[in-house]
Amino acid sequence: MAARMDPGIGGDVTLLHTSQLDNLINLARASSLYYLTFGLACCGIELMQTGGPRADVMRFGAIPRASPRQADFMIVAGTLTYKMAERARLLYDQMPEPKYVISMGSCSNCGGLFQLGYSVCKGVDKVIPVDVYVPGCPPRPEALTEGLLRLQEIVRSEPWSTKRRPAAQAEGA
């Protein structure tokens, strides 16, 4: 970085030169992530709090979207049953590349308290690829914010043209 005086502005101007276009594109992508919510149980209530004033994720550039075709990543929160796994996979497949998934809470990470149930999927990663796991039952909104920051690090570090693996078949589906 170099600082110089610009007589037209009347102050120090910091010039930043990026040698790779990928770095600039990834910085822009990481700072404007659109997300799709998939709240299924009590973690969905905590997910709603992330849009509130206390844990406002919009200050990090994360904006909710209603359509998977406009979303960069999906937040799966709560107990995923085999019937809902089909819908989660469908929503994931409708998202444009590159796409990411945050698994929020013990139930979506590994089945949680209900993992012995016959209809409960033993983790979202059995259905779709997961990039960030947020632990807790239910996790606090601050934990989801930390997961979002981790996802931004992942987006910044990988090439922007990276292709993701397709969604897997659900167990028992």
UniProtKB/Swiss-Prot annotation:
One of the GO biological process terms: aerobic respiration
PROSITE patterns reported in the protein's UniProt record: COMPLEX1_20K
Superkingdom assignment: Bacteria
Residues the record lists as binding [4Fe-4S] cluster: C42, C43, C107, C137
Known catalytic reactions: a quinone + NADH + 5 H(+)(in) = a quinol + NAD(+) + 4 H(+)(out)
Catalytic class of the enzyme: translocase
The entry's keywords: 4Fe-4S, Cell inner membrane, Cell membrane, Iron, Iron-sulfur, Membrane, Metal-binding, NAD, Quinone, Translocase, Transport, Ubiquinone
Annotated cofactor note: Binds 1 [4Fe-4S] cluster.
One term under GO cellular component: respiratory chain complex I
A single MF term (Gene Ontology): NADH dehydrogenase (ubiquinone) activity
Membrane topology listed for this record: Peripheral membrane protein
Subcellular location field: Cell inner membrane
Role summary: NDH-1 shuttles electrons from NADH, via FMN and iron-sulfur (Fe-S) centers, to quinones in the respiratory chain. The immediate electron acceptor for the enzyme in this species is believed to be ubiquinone. Couples the redox reaction to proton translocation (for every two electrons transferred, four hydrogen ions are translocated across the cytoplasmic membrane), and thus conserves the redox energy in a proton gradient.
Oligomer status and interactors: NDH-1 is composed of 14 different subunits. Subunits NuoB, C, D, E, F, and G constitute the peripheral sector of the complex.
HAMAP family: NDH1_NuoB
UniProt name for this protein: NADH-quinone oxidoreductase subunit B 1
Natural source organism: Anaeromyxobacter sp. (strain K)
